[in-house]
UniProtKB/Swiss-Prot annotation:
Function: Involved in the gluconeogenesis. Catalyzes the conversion of oxaloacetate (OAA) to phosphoenolpyruvate (PEP) through direct phosphoryl transfer between the nucleoside triphosphate and OAA.
Enzyme class: lyase
Primary localisation category: cytoplasm
One cellular component term from this protein's GO annotations in UniProt: cytosol
This protein's name: Phosphoenolpyruvate carboxykinase (ATP)
Residues binding substrate: 61, 195, 201, 323
EC number: 4.1.1.49
Length: 537
């Protein structure tokens, strides 16, 4: 077996059980991975130097094909209400079949860190069949220096083989596509899909399992820090604006998707960004556009002009879930340490497909826990397989697919941290205004940015607020530079009776969804629920 590249020879591929390989390319950087991806026909170049790959059949995550080993430990520590299980025996069969499938291959290996805080990071080794997948995960996680690579001993190992086809009867899974995690052995197996996001979310899921035991709250959020050292975190599902809104030229970016919150503040799990880039433009998102238009960026399912090879970010013919992966250092004001102090503001982003939520609302601590556990948003087209237009969804903790533990674990941690550090909490609607999806229009990003700026710099505290009659939270009545009508959603609807009926419908959906949490929360959190009676007064 031919092995090339810097690595710890005492802990090579054979330690993972990989045998009879043709070779392993260890810790190759972007230029080498570009060469292999292009030579192997995996990807093409854009005119700006980005590496462009298609993911084929799977253009999003497949949460129904994700499985966790149920053993004596996970039997009681896992949230089985939101996760699917396989037996240890089924996982072992799958693992051995992965190893057999890899024989004769040349694999790409990356040794990386999940987590910017050395006290809580997990040493992660990723074997990939495709060179562009190796570049993707190298871009998304954090990269050790050469000395660390020479002594690197992995704690978590991923093997990613898109050409592998699972057998549901043999492996206990649902289809030929599979993501399987064994927390006891710290192994992740990914097969049957070329969608690279499965790798990063598998590392995230692993950190979500282990970090609460260490007193760290793992979060599906972006984070940035202002000139006064004021940290803000932004919760939200894919497509709700985490990446876009945290990329603010006036604030330092900590990260766009995954963070931990512990005794020393906030830290990024990653070393790169993974931005949705449908309709990406230099006017609306200049930093993300520039980062996606250069050497080192990886574009997924983005259509290129046949002649000029310029990306057409408006073309969603392959999927609405087009993506750009790029290193954090491509953002001019990104933090290279990936760490910041205790948050002063928590922002919960919701893409309200009903168009009845205000563009911003201030939450009490009890309301913050209520809306965190509710995780209301809309599934945005293309983020998951089979979703072609927004659908209302309650995804607890704004990340249900990535929660290995019961949501109350994360909810209680959030409430304690908010109280301890006297954090201001906000709910921001980046979804629809002027009507339900299909009738109204998307909330203007300029309005969202203006309101967020005022919230984060403290000026929004000094304006007059009203109590929303449906949801009970505090809504500003005016802000300089923002049309006052847009702050009160009913004023943006032509049909006021339709607004009332739609708002009541959504209130009922909140109440129905939260019923499963009522026994696990205090009375003040239950009282923070939207109330139809309140709306009737």
């Amino acid at each position: 077996m031919q092995e090339t590249g810097v690595h710890n020879g005492a802990h090579g591929a054979d330690k993972f059980g990989l045998k009879n390989l043709k070779g392993v390319y260890w810790n190759f950087a972007a230029p080498q991975l570009y060469e292999h991806a292009l030579k192997n026909g995996e990807a093409v170049l854009s005119a700006d130097g980005a590496l462009c790959a298609d993911t084929g059949e799977f253009t999003g995550r497949s949460p129904k094909d994700k499985f966790t080993v149920r053993d004596a430990t996970t039997e009681t520590t896992m949230w089985w209400g939101g996760n699917q299980s396989i037996t240890a025996e089924q996982f072992e069969t799958l693992y051995q079949d992965f190893l057999k499938h890899a024989e004769g291959m040349t694999l790409f290996a990356q040794d990386l860190y999940g987590g910017a805080d050395p006290s809580f990071q997990i040493k992660t080794r990723v074997f990939t069949e495709l060179a562009w997948h190796s570049l993707f995960i190298r871009t998304l996680l954090r990269r050790p220096d050469r000395a660390a690579l020479e002594s690197f001993v992995p704690e978590l190992t991923l093997i990613d083989l898109p050409s592998f086809r699972a057998d549901p009867k043999r492996h206990g899974c649902r289809s030929e596509n599979v993501v399987a995690i064994d927390f006891a052995r710290k192994i992740v197996l990914i097969g049957g899909t070329q969608y690279a996001g499965e790798m990063k979310k598998s590392v995230f899921t692993t950190l979500n399992y282990y970090l609460p035991e260490k007193g760290v709250m793992p979060m599906h959020c972006s984070a940035n820090v202002g000139p006064q050292g004021d940290t803000a975190i932004f919760f939200g599902l894919s497509g709700t604006g985490k990446t876009t809104l945290s990329a603010d030229p006036n604030r330092t970016l900590i990260g766009d998707d995954e963070h931990g919150w512990g005794k020393d503040g906030v830290f990024n799990f990653e070393g790169g960004c993974y931005a949705k880039c449908i309709k990406l433009s230099p006017e609306a998102e200049p930093e993300i556009f520039a980062a996606s238009s250069r050497f080192g960026a990886v574009l997924e399912n983005v259509v290129l002009d046949e002649i000029t090879r310029k990306p057409d970010f408006d073309d969603g013919s392959k999927t609405e879930n087009t993506r750009s992966a790029y290193p954090l250092e491509s953002i001019p004001n990104a933090s290279l340490t990936g760490r910041a102090g205790q948050p002063k503001n928590v922002v919960m982003l919701a893409a309200d497909a009903f168009g009845v939520m205000p563009p911003i609302a201030k939450l009490t601590p009890a309301q913050a826990m209520y809306h965190f556990l509710s995780g209301y948003t809309a599934k945005v087209a293309g983020t998951e397989r089979g979703v072609t237009e927004p659908e209302p969804e309650f995804s607890t903790c704004f990340g249900s697919p990535f929660l290995p533990r019961d949501p109350s674990v994360y909810g209680n941690m959030l409430r304690e941290l908010i109280a301890k550090h006297d954090v201001d909490c906000w709910l921001v609607n980046t979804g629809w205004t002027g009507g339900i999806y299909g009738t109204g229009h998307r909330m203007p990003i300029k309005v969202t940015r203006a309101l967020l700026t005022a919230a984060l710099d403290g000026s929004l505290r000094n304006v007059e607020f009203r109590t929303d009659p449906y949801f009970g939270f505090a809504v500003p009545t005016s802000l300089h530079g923002v049309p006052s009508d847009i702050l009160d959603p009913v004023k943006t609807w032509a049909d006021k009776a339709a607004f009332d009926a739609t708002a009541r419908k959504l209130v009922g959906m909140f109440q129905k969804n939260f019923a499963k949490f009522e026994a696990q929360v205090d009375a003040d959190v239950r009282a923070a629920a939207p109330d139809v009676k309140m709306a009737a007064e």
